[in-house]
Amino acid sequence: MQVILLDKVAQLGTVGDQVTVKAGFARNYLIPQGKAVMATAANIAHFEARRAELEAKAAEALSAAQARAAAIANLAAIVITSKAGDDGRLFGSVGVRDIAEAVSAAGVAVTKSEVRLPEGALRTIGEHEVKLHLHAEVNAVVTINVVSE
C-alpha cells in the first residue's frame, strides 16, 4: 500500500516521502496516528499544497525537543525516595511514571512514554542513567538517584 508520510517515522522515511508499507501497518498505525495518508492523486495534490506547512511543523517539533534536551542536560541528579531494605533493594520499584513525574517536577515536562528503561523498572538504590526519547532524532540522558526513606 502506498502512503505519503506526514511525520518522520523511524526506519521508514521523513515528511513527504511516498513509501510502500503493508496494508495493516498503514491502516492500524500510520493513518490513525496521523503519521501518513493514502497516496491517492487527490491526497498527493493536497499534500504538495501543504508541504511547506508540514515541514515547518516538523522543524518546530524538532527544535522544541532539542530545547527540552538541553534543559534536561542542565538538570542535576534527580532524587527519588523509596522504601528499601538493608541490602539496598527497594520494596517495589521506581517505574517510568515515577521518573516522568520527578523530571516534570524538576521543571522539564516529560511524559511516561518518553522514558526508556530497557532493563525494566529500577529496583535498587543508587544512581541510574535513564534515557529519554523526546523526538525521533532527539534523545537525552538524566541521572536518577534513588535513595532510601
Curated annotation (Swiss-Prot):
GO cellular component, one term: ribonucleoprotein complex
Pfam families: Ribosomal_L9_C, Ribosomal_L9_N
Keyword Cell membrane on entry: no
Alphabetical UniProt keywords: Ribonucleoprotein, Ribosomal protein, RNA-binding, rRNA-binding
Biological process, per Gene Ontology: translation
UniProt GO MF annotations: rRNA binding; structural constituent of ribosome
PANTHER family for this protein: 50S RIBOSOMAL PROTEIN L9 (PTHR21368)
Family: Belongs to the bacterial ribosomal protein bL9 family.
Function: Binds to the 23S rRNA.
Name of this chain's protein: Large ribosomal subunit protein bL9
Natural source organism: Glaesserella parasuis serovar 5 (strain SH0165)
